[in-house]
Amino acid sequence: WDIDGNEYIDFALGDTGAMAGHRSPEVVTAIVNRVQELGGLTTMMPTEDAEWVAANLTERFGIAKWSFSLTATDANRWAIRLVRAITGKPKILFHSYCYHGSVDESLIITSPDGNGMNRPGNVGSPVDVTMTSRVAEFNDIEGMERELAKGDVAAVLMEPALTNIGIVLPEPGYLKAVRELTRKYDALLIIDETHTFSADWGGMTRRDGLEPDVFVIGKAIAGGIPIGTYGLSEELAARVLGRTDLDLIDMGGVGGTLAGNPLSMSAARATLEKVLTKENFAKMIDLATYYTETVNALFDKYDLPWSINQLGARAEYRFAKPYPITGTAAAESADHELEDFIHLYLANRGVLLTPFHNMALMCPTTTKADVDRHNLVFEEVIQKLAGA
């Protein structure tokens, strides 16, 4: 509800931060218990909840050792520092129009000549992004190899599907090829599933058998309480811990005073143990499939050159057909004026999509009736646009 008492169906869900839903009773109970009964909201010491959460993350994603932060952005930043220190290489390779929060190095896109340049809106960047980063188009394995072959890439940091420029899915074999290339050119692989966690209980990493050296996630795993985390493979963790010359205890540039605090850990345990379960994921994915199929049917009914992609519990349409397979092509398909009109029309009738793009996300309490309501209003939008 808003301050005027208007009720909304929320498909934005805090741009994934509320994928567990709003005010989940299990999460509320855990938070209240921590605040009122257990106390110690920030202690700089681990809790039993932290141990449980790390074990659950290992079960889900297959990664051995975990360290916590307050955002996935910070988890990415700290992972970048570690891989640079371990490899001795200065640059990180990204996909054009990727999303890794506000990490400076990630705000790079391919330029018209095929090289890198600052992404539009990269305000106040500390250095030219090409000094710290390299870039390739998603699904362009030749471009990926070209950049890795330059020999200065410490790691590829990637979403296994682009999520902030539409949902750009990997072409068959692409993710496996990237992993093979990182090994060929002695670079590490960091997979950020902060958004793509919607794919499955164990994200795309478990679903698709991915093998990252570093795994990053945040947003949804604590039910809306600030959290992020990065995990290291057994091999990489041993390399990091074996580097006694790295000051990782105090001023190493990795870690934070509030990271892993008891409140975040209590919320994360409740979310992972009782809300984002295998059963709820199955329900959420089924609803997203229904959303995708019914929205696509509207495109067909009105002969619109639009398309929609689904990634587990999320789906998103673009004003292009077929759906773009690179970040640049997806960016070129954007129509911000049309997007704003659709979002405003829906919002004025009680339906929220994710701002800045057309993503709909399901949570455990989303219903078929919610999707049907969206479709009813969305068809009204289409009719107005088509002059029907």
Residue spans for each PLM region:
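Conserved N-terminal phosphate-binding loop of PLP-dependent enzymes in the Aspartate aminotransferase
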Residues: W1-A388
